[in-house]
Amino acid sequence: MATRWQDGLEMVRRCDQAGVQLFVVKQNRRNATLQLLKRAIQRGRFGRIYMATINVFWSRPQSYYDGAAWRGTWEFDGGALMNQASHYVDLVDWLVGPVESVQAYVATLARNIQVEDTATVGVRWRSGALGSINVTMLTYPKNLEGSITIIGEKGTAKVGGVAVNQIQHWEFADSDPDDEEVRSASYETTSVYGFGHPLYYENVVKVLRGAAHAETDGREGLRSLELLIASYISARDGRRVALPLEY
């Protein structure tokens, strides 16, 4: 929704003042694979969650960045975390819960750009769970993986593929009717964008007609933006950064 924390806050404030809706696209939440994972968490099937890891191993050659002047810039794009991995960073809070703190490292290892092409973020959730976000745009020779793995007291699951489109591991101490949907929830895709956008826009239309509440509004967008900004502050200053940020 923004590349700067204060810009995101200002967007929410001004929309509130004007009495208009602010919608933020979070299409990955609509994936059938992640809907199953979300329900498993909500139903307590994991028990206590111990660890969660997100991997975004994609490829963006120099020609991609050279193709448009805004790409690879701090002002208009952001780096691998802010741009390509932002929808995966969104899963950190949406699935596992509020984050206590982050410790991040970012680097520009191969591309001629202002921003990072590679990053890793250590995460501690308020629940005590630990995990990481690992991102690179340098995967050879093409996009390899967009995944989330959750390890808990009573269950382990991995949703992977190139764009969280395949349930690759699904094992719990108990059984649930959702277990029968695991195979059908997975799908093949050649696009990292998935197929969640139509369902997102369906919610937007319903909201504008007064038939629903916005599922991903401006305040929801701030949750992942806050985590992103905290990660950049951590990498810049070489320290652990606690959340929430100062408003």
Each language-model region and where it sits:
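Short polybasic amphipathic segments
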Residues: 148, 164-180
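Predominantly a Rossmann-like dinucleotide-binding segment in NAD(P)-dependent oxidoreductases
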Residues: 21, 28-113, 238
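Contiguous beta-strand/loop segments that form the cofactor/metal-binding neighborhood of enzyme cores
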Residues: 89-166, 198-211, 246-247
